[in-house]
Amino acid sequence: MKILIIFIIFIISYISGFEIPKGFGIGLVIPDAECLNYIGDPIDQQLCNSKLQNNGDRIYTTTNSQIDSQTNIKKSFEAITFLQDQCKDLLFAQFGICDIYLAPCIEVTLTPLKSISLPQRFCKSVCDRMVSNCPRLEEQMDCSNSFLFPEIGTFYDLSPYGYTIDNGTFAVPCSDPTIFFNQVSSNSSFIEICPSPLLLKNSSDPEYAANKGYSYLSPSNCVLPCPVPNYSNQKWDQLLTMSKILSTISFILSLYNVLTFGIINKKVSDPHKCTCFFSGSIALVNLCDIITYGIGYEELLCPEPGRSAKQQLDPVCGLTGAFFHLGITYCVLWSMTMGLVLYCSVKRQKWFKFNYFLIGNTTFTITTVVIAAATSKFEAGLGSIECWIRDRWYAISLFWIPCGIALLIGSFCIIAVIHEVYKTSKKSISNRNDLLQRELKPLLIVIFISGSFLYLFIFFFDIERKFGGYRSAVEDYVLCLLNGSQEECFTTGPSYVPYFLFYLVIRWFGIIFFLFYGTSNIARKIWVQNKIWKSISSSISPKSTPKSSPKNSDSKINSNSTNNNNMILNDNNDKNLNEKKAVELESIKIN
């Protein structure tokens, strides 16, 4: 395009026989152009109202050119908003940009009834000043182009329009807004514009301080939207839908385990207590999700545009964050305790005291919750679907390191249990199939508990390792927005599939424990022996039997109940092996 313009100017000069004086450029005449007043800035965006010479009177205007110019000015202002740490005198640059796109206009009278409008092009000296103060502007401004940036002025050939003075040429001096800038700059301010979906906030205003949940993109006052656009809206919807469905199911099944092993169970053993507390912990984690989607994910996590929820400003975020931390920490500690219970049972050790672990687990968990709450560390953060501890060192100190140690202990205990099961079975049972059947359940527990938490650990520390790269990649996101391409722009973050799996793992524990424990033989026996269940069975049984007297009916029910109890006892006697080791193995398998 630039070569084409130079070629046209050369042809015009050659045909007219006019020699261009030094310091001047040759301009093209647009017959339909007019000198009009500035239409004014858009209602919702300040641009050039206070930055135009002569208050914006007589602006060179072609068809829709002022609207198009405003679009270009807005894009230029967006770009230099992010150059504040690389450039100086950017306020002057904005005056220059307004003068370039909304050029002053001179009207030349050709005849009493006819005139033509010509633009005053931007002076090269002013262009050089802008580029020297901000070298990045050189990418968009070629100050050596005399057509756009003449040193003195621009010659226009008006002979085709009937102008005869000076061989039909008319000289228009270049525009220099320096004097005007010096007069009004003290009353003018630099205009920051953030490309959508970034939002403009005043970081110096305490109401919009960074510690209130705003994520500023230095050196500007632009903040990232909430939630952060790491993924498309479709992927966010998939993640939130998964969370709603799994959390609800997991919550119900966890309560079932608590009811079965902790409330209606007549003989609550130590393994049953561990199962009960573990399931209760998972229910607490899922309750946070239920509260969150009950209120609304964006309403709770992003209470204001561009602001993520913080404990000190958003009490519900602090409450759900405390519940989540209490639940997930308790969950890890009780998984460790379950491993110790199984190990002591197989080794026939007497040192395990359940109440000690109950006090220890509860004390540690509550202490970490109190520390996090007292220091206001519960917040939504960037790109998350629940409130929790987002401060890096607090999260590592209060959860990942201590709970990682607990998981390691629990995993070693469960591995030791499997080893003891193998040794005992080898001595007393020769059938390999029976050996595999006995080891299958604890082996699956190891895979699902330890493996799941191991994935959470790896994912978290992998994000921490790459966090610096994610932050530096924000520049690419901003460039994508500034380029105005048709493609959707995203910030750089964790890959979607591992991120989705991270939240999936946290929410499947209730379902997994129901499959392990809620469907076990001992769970069914607990319900069969429950008084309420018996009364329901008794009320249903007569309806399916022939008519008889009440006494006979009661006698049959009692007889059936007695027979059922005898059958259960006989089944239990059949299942108990003569050797004590085999009995212990059966107990481990059930629990």
From Swiss-Prot:
Glycans are attached at residues 167, 187, 202, 230, 483. Belongs to the G-protein coupled receptor Fz/Smo family. The keyword Transmembrane applies. InterPro entries: Frizzled_dom_sf (IPR036790), GPCR_2_secretin-like (IPR000832), GPCR_Fz/Smo-like (IPR050949). Keywords: Disulfide bond, Glycoprotein, Membrane, Receptor, Signal, Transmembrane, Transmembrane helix. Disulfide bonds join 35-105, 48-98, 123-174. This is Frizzled and smoothened-like protein F. Residues 30-177 form the FZ domain. Residues 266-275, 343-353, 419-442, 517-591 are cytoplasmic. It is a multi-pass membrane protein. Residues 538-571 have a biased composition (Low complexity). Residues 1-17 form the signal peptide. GO terms for molecular function: G protein-coupled receptor activity. GO terms for cellular component: membrane. The keyword Glycoprotein applies. The chain crosses the membrane at residues 245-265, 276-296, 322-342, 354-374, 398-418, 443-463, 496-516. It comes from Dictyostelium discoideum (Social amoeba). It is found in: Membrane. Coiled coil: none annotated. Pfam families: 7tm_2.
